[in-house]
Amino acid sequence: MQNRIYWNNSNNNMQKGIALATCMAIVMGLFTGCGNKNDQQIAASPDEVQKGRYVETELSLPEEWKDKNISQIFRSGDELHFLVAGGAEGQVSLEEWMLGEGDTLTEVTKDWLKALPDGKGLESRDSFTLLQDAEGNQYLYGNCYRDEESSSAHLWKEADGSALDITPQKWLEPMDMDGYRFYDTPQYVTLTEDELLVGLSYFSLDVVLAQDGSLVSSQESDSLTDSGSLSDNKWVSAVGDTLYLAQADEQGNVNGLLQMQLDGNNGAKSKGEIPFSQDSYSSAYFSVLGDGTVYAADADGFFRCDAGDTNWQKLLQGIDTGFSLSDQWCRDIVALSDGSVYAWFGSESGDKIMIYRYDPDAVTEVTEELTLYTVEESFFLQQAAVQYHKQHPEILIHVDAAISMTDKYSGNADYQQIYQDLNTSLTSGNGPDLMVMDHLKLDTYASKGLLLNLQEILQPMEEDGSLLSNITKAYEETDGARYAVPLQFGLLLAVGRDVQPEEMSSMDAIAKAVSRKTESYMGDRTCGELVEEFYPLIVDDILQNRQVNRDTLRPWLEDLKKIADNCGILPSRKEGRAANIWDLGSDVKLVLQETDGFNEAMMPYAVAELLNANVVSMENAFYPKMVIGINSRSEHVETAKEFLRFALSEELQSVDTYEGFPVNAKALETQAAADRSMAEAYTTYDIDGSTVEFAIKSYSEETANHLTELCRAATLCLKEDTQIETSLTESLQAYLNGQASVEEAMDAVEGSLKMYLAE
């Protein structure tokens, strides 16, 4: 089945990545192609001081907002307005505020809005949108989700100083889809100059009369685009009689801004398109001025497209904005005619309003630029580069990712080609300053003298207890040198239903346990899937003195055969996937779960609670994450060292980016004690043929402390070698099918690795 999931969080940036990582239906790069984004400012010569640029500052919010939530930022006339929600549960109060000269905030709430909440059972966390027509009449839309049994939509209009409910009947009537009851309620609403309210939901674009809420037209949202779909944030804006909607490609990246014309009862028709190329981990946000000028922002920067044009000018680099930070997420942006742009960010510490204004006297400060190469796109690394630049404005760290999150989780990554390309770059002297080398054979780089010894950085931090030395010493050479260090790590957890902890604490224990069972405990597997799951346990020991270590290989093969006999080996997988934690309630009894951090651990522990299952750390094993090294030939070695110290610091590592546990000891304690309520999610789960509601909720303090101890006790580093994995997969098919002996299997492995060992 396809599980529905509802996140108790508006962190679009991070959830876009999580969606790929967990296959849940929710969560950097350069802009290319049509609608190119060009730097607005002409580059100065090296001897010139370049003046004039956009500058980011934070708006100071009034003390009266301390216990309230911003529900909306919007433009009224040519002034920035805020809708703020507060008050006790079930008796929410709404206030309208205006930003004036000197960035002062003044309350301008009309009487009808003050009287609105009586008896409505609203909450300050609900989503509200305030709209105003040319005559000053106001309308309020509330999206107030409570449960699947009632509609979340409410639409009121100002009428003689009080609120008149004009919610369209369509939004109040339940719909059925594959047995699920739901309401097709708008995520965004906007108001046209003709006093038509337009609501955009996941399924439809509705046009209603602002006068009484009667439905004028309704059309499927999928019909609005010729290719792709509307973007995830379901944004719509009206300027004059033109609607603007963001279109996305199959990966969810915005690739165009659609311009639609309302045509009476026929709904919206295409009027034009402003191309917008995006390959960024964050959602894109837009604001359209009355003259048709469009402002856009995402993690790559701030951009402007003049009215009637289709080319975008870059106003500010993404690294100089809050959009590049993974511990906060944008809710909306608003541009004014003077060129200033305001961005509303949410964070665990509350709302933030960032201001972007052009300062003709501001000087570009960057004097040193470094490149941080990473095999895989990463929130943590982007956060590190942004934060370091904020502390050191004269230094800019460019993060260059070989593989986007989309490619990583689609299985399109060619790590061997990436390894060869990086090797060529390093040996030619054109390599990056810092490298994150996950999935690559970094021993090769170290043996060629291409990596700097990091011992002088790591040893003092380990000796004073700043780092988890059980993790950071994973790449220590026999002579004590260290050419790489993991910035984060994941735990290998085994989750078993009707399986005792001691029966899944190691590969050997699993092999013994399942060999006594007739029922398949892990579900059928192909040879490659089984090898992929278990080969990291021995990859570091399988080769010794450029020969296959048969003493290590034999017991691993014998255990693998026992597990294969219980699973059942498929010749190939033509459809579907190998069983995972979503199948523990029905098809399998045991799964291995790579768990990358405290937030990610909510999933296996929630499943265990739901199924009364057990969770253990398998073999005290960990996956090294973001294994970083410094190019010994870099012209910026000292700066690279300082950046690495910063990347290992408590300050940076205390934020959980869903990519791993921190190697900083104090950050580990900070994350363990963190409030995880914003990461909670609600979905459904299959148990023995029945579908039940499933809450992925924060676990207890006891569990958090237990996870901390597992992190401190982890000793077995699970490394990767794609060549060894391929050789094992090619060599073991006959053995796992019972057509070859263990001796023959070892001979086949040796033969397959002969050329690899000769390199």
Could you tell me what each predicted segment is?
Residues G29-G33:
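C-terminal motif of bacterial Sec signal peptides marking the signal peptidase cleavage site
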Residues Y682-L757:
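C-terminal capping/gating helix-and-loop segments adjacent to ligand/active sites or protein-protein/ligand interfaces
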Residues H439-L493, D508, K512, A608-V615:
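Hinge/lid segment of periplasmic solute-binding proteins
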Residues K66-R75, G119-D133, P174-L191, T225-G240, ...:
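Repeated scaffold domains used in trafficking and secretory/extracellular systems
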